Amino acid sequence: MTDDAVAIQKAIDRCSAEGGGLVLLSRNHVFLSGPVELKSNVELHLEATAMLKANPDEGIYRLSAFGENCGEGMLWLWANDAENISITGKGTIHGNGIAFMGAELGDSYELKPLADQTFDPRPHVLTLKNVQNLTIRDVTIKEGAYWTVHLIGCNEAVIDGINLLNNLKIRNGDGIDLDHSKNVRIANCHITSGDDCICLKNRREFEQYGSCHDIVVTNCVMSSRSCAIKIGSENMDSIYNVVFDNCIITGSNRGLGIQNRDEGTVTDVVFSNIQLDCRLWSDVWWGKAEPIYVTSYPRANGNHKDANWRFPKGQIEGRCGEVSRIYFNNITALSENGCFVGGDEPGKVKDIYFNNVRVKLVGNTGNIMMDKRPCKGEGFVKVGRDELLKMRVPLLTEHAQVEVR
C-alpha cells in the first residue's frame, strides 16, 4: 500500500514557493494519502474520476485538529495562516470514514474504545485555520470519519456546488463547520451528514479569532441524523448577521436549530423560504424531530473527553448568553414533533418571530419529548401531542418571548 502524501506535499510546497499555481490530481487514479498541508496561492484540482483517499492507518494522524485539545480528532488535509487557497474539480476527496469506526448499530456506528481518553485518532477531512480568500468548488467530499469541512478564523470564503456525502451512521460526521469565521458564502450544495450539515460556532480553543458573522447560505439540499442547520452548541463569543435562504431539508432528526450552551450571544439571524421534514431517530443523536429549535441553557458539567475545554479556564461550570432577533419566514414542515423555543430564565431568549410558518404533525402519537441536551438538569421535556395539535403553529416555549404572525 503506497502512501502518496510525500509526493503530493512536494508538489504543493514547490508550487507555493514559486509564487503559486495548480496542483493536479489526474483522472482515473486513487491517491491514498496521509496528512497533507495546503499552502498559500495553490489550487488543488481533482479531475473527474480522480480520488484522494485517507490512509486508514490511525497511527499516522498525530497533529490535533483542535490545537492543545487532542480529544476531538486529528488533521488530514489542513492549512494554517494562509491565503488564496482553492480546492476545485469534479473529483472526489474520500475520508475513509468506516475504517475508523467500531461496530455497526441500527442507525449509527459505535465509536472505537480509546486507550487514551484524551486522544482521538479519527482524522478530520479539511481543517482550514486563518485562511484569507478560500474557495471550495464542485468537488465531491465523502465518508468523513469526523468533521468534514472546518473553517477556523477564515475570512472571505466561498463554498459552491459541492457534494458532501457522509455516511449517515457516523457520529460527529459534521458537514461544514464555520468556527470564528466571517464573510462566508455557501451555495448550491448537497449535504448528507450523520451530524449537523452546516453548523456555526465559536469554540474556546480558537478564541483569538473573534466572532462569527456575515454568513449567507442559499440553495442547498440537506439531510442529517442530527440538526441540518445549526448554530452552537459551542459559542464563547458572538454570532450575528446570518442568512439561511431557499433550502430543502429531508429526513432529519432536527431541522433548524440554535443551541446556545455557552456565554456567547446569537443575534440577527434569518431563516427563510425553507421546506423541511423531520423524523425521529435514536437518542444517540441530539434532537426529537423538532423542525425549529431555539434554546439557551447552561452546558452540563461532566467527564467528557474534552471537558477541560468546555468552560472558561479555571471554571467548572458556565453560563449561557442571549439569543434574540431571530426570524423564521416562509417555513413549511412535515414533522413528528412540534417546535421548541426555550431558555434557562426569562429574557434570555427573546424577539423570536415566526412569520408564515406551517408545521404539519405526522407519524408520532401520544406524548412527545422535546430534547434540551446538552444542558444542566433534565434533558427532555414531555408535552402532549393533543396540546400541540390545538395550536396554529405547534410550539412549546419555556421562558421565551415568541411572536407568531
Q: Model-found features: residue ranges?
A:
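Extracellular/periplasmic carbohydrate-active domains that bind, remodel
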Residues: 1-405
